[in-house]
């Protein structure tokens, strides 16, 4: 059985950077507001993708790009298999990074982020 090589962690007691996204051999810490904005961006891209998904053929390629500052997202792939590229640039321009989630984990990581954020209510 292959070990899961990604995840999302939340620890509000950690202070400023209380969210952690882990993929393979890297991780990134996010502030609560950054994570909230990421969640909102992912919901937006999911809604747009869902609205056109039913019209796609199984092997038809799709590319969606959405910018909701400080995030930029690009979904690329097919109806049921897609990857996701995310770019973050802080409003203060003090830090920036790019994340790439390949096809095997993009969808799963998206739902983990959604689950973690929605569990905070």
What kind of region is each of these model predictions?
Residues 1-121:
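Positively charged, low-complexity terminal tracts
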